């Protein structure tokens, strides 16, 4: 008989390609590693449409913000694997069709 936890883990959605190979868990290193990956793949000054296309391809949900001072746009993708939920977020600003500011965050919440 297969344990229920093993079956649930096997059903979890995959990690998005942008985060593959990075540490997961509740540590500052996990959040920092995702931010560094985002910064290296889409450095400020690069074309914003490339970032948006990649995030959409990876099934991130993109949202515009008028209420935040720091970033105009964000995208998030979550992966639920009971009892936990991983969430990756990317925040950015655009000026003249280029990324002017960028930040990636990762979080893990468990019951």
Predicted region positions:
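Bacterial signal peptide processing site
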Residues: 12-15
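Sec-dependent signal peptide recognition
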Residues: 1-4
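Amphipathic N-proximal alpha-helical interface segments
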Residues: 80-109
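Cys/His-rich zinc-coordinating "finger/knuckle" motifs
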Residues: 18, 67, 91
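A cross-family detector of function-defining hotspots
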Residues: 53-88
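C-terminal motif of bacterial Sec signal peptides marking the signal peptidase cleavage site
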Residues: 8-10
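Terminal, regulation- and interaction-focused segments at domain boundaries
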Residues: 18-53, 58
């Amino acid at each position: 008989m297969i344990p229920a936890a093993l079956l649930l883990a096997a059903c979890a959605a995959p990690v998005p390609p942008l985060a593959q190979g990075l540490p997961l868990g509740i540590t500052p290193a996990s959040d920092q590693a995702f931010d560094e990956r985002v910064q290296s793949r889409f450095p400020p000054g690069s074309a914003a449409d490339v970032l948006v296309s990649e995030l959409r391809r990876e099934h991130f949900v993109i949202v515009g913000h008028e209420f935040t001072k720091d970033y105009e746009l964000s995208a998030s993708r979550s992966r639920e694997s009971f009892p936990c939920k991983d969430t990756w977020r990317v925040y950015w600003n655009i000026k003249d069709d280029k990324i002017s500011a960028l930040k990636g965050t990762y979080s893990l919440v468990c019951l």
